[in-house]
Amino acid sequence: MKTTYTSKAARAALALFTALPTSTAYAANGTFFYHSPQSGDLEMEDPDNGECRLLLQGADSALNQTDTKATLYFDQGCEEPAGTLLPGQSKSFGAPIPHSVQFG
């Protein structure tokens, strides 16, 4: 009977584990603020982790008020890193300015 109980517990744990979403499914909690030279102050609320997000007309400054690191990129496709902002960090950028961001 002990083997049956252990087996049931193991199957239940496995079912629970496989039902959990992967890390890319999570959203960063909080707001990412940035300033675009042409568009002014903008923000992203609870952005998805792992998704490359366009910064409208680029960002000359950014503030990461999410609970996840934000990696900024000079290009629009998240391929040319411009720097990383940990939760609570901010940064101003000179030329060239970042044009995309990815969380996680």
Regions found by a protein language model. Name each.
Residues 2-104:
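Compact beta-sheet-dominated domain cores in extracellular/mature segments
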